[in-house]
């Protein structure tokens, strides 16, 4: 299945100067992966991976695609999140770092997310217990089996996608010529990071309406806790204090933001999404990353605070990696700085020019 996405065409066109041509419209499709085996030993006869593409593939004399870039979303997101103006308007236009006239951009929805196969499609809690390795395997099969991509110019990943980029670099080295992992650490999910995830899962499961995942009415109390924890985890406290300096302003923002977030996600999907990080740990294999890599975190990231000292130790082991820590300010966005390209687009342009 492939279809054009008219609203996204309008958004992309809005990034262009008046004299520029409108880019080729985004195209949405599904990769149906047969006999998909998960790391747990579970199997599905078919696994669907939804994807969106921008631009046109360019081929060499052998017919191989030479300009493919894959961008990977975070937990609970989809590939279409990268059409937000703070990302798309800084990167995809003429002369910008990921100009769609130059690159063939691939935006997958990962397993358990968006239009891809997920528990809420019907299997609920009997859906295979996927992990990040399964997600990367599905990405690889989508690229090679459906899109005919055997080599990527770049993998750019944010948050969960950042961790996927580290998996690609350590377990499938060389498939991507360059890596850009933003907003994560290349270490096992533990400490506070694992705790807020399991607190969310526990809250959903403790809601009497959840009924072991077989609910007919969404478990609102559990989902409310999930949305609350997510709001805190992704925020920048410096910006919130500067922008909402009174009790009334802070509470109004909280209520408005919560109203936008609450009810968007299925409870079982949320459980799976958060738990899929349980086996992630590229730490023992970091020396395998031997391609130019731009790794960026932000100092105001609640999920990946810089004081851990992990980044210094990791960067010393990755000889081709440049690590940048974006200083905290009232303008940065906490963990979500990863999607605000104005903070790092010049560094990305330098990576691509190497």
Place the predicted regions along the sequence by residue:
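N-terminal cap/lid subdomain of alpha/beta-hydrolase-fold enzymes
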Residues: 52-120
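Conserved acidic catalytic loop of the alpha/beta-hydrolase fold
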Residues: 133-154
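Conserved hydrolase catalytic core segment
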Residues: 150-191
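Alpha/beta-hydrolase-fold enzymes
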Residues: 175-260
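Active-site nucleophile elbow and catalytic-triad environment of alpha/beta-hydrolase enzymes
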Residues: 269-285
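Short beta-strand/loop motif that positions the catalytic acidic residue
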Residues: 289, 295-297
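Conserved alpha/beta-hydrolase "acid-adjacent" motif
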Residues: 302-309
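Catalytic active-site module of serine/aspartate enzymes centered on a nucleophile-bearing elbow/loop
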Residues: 321-354
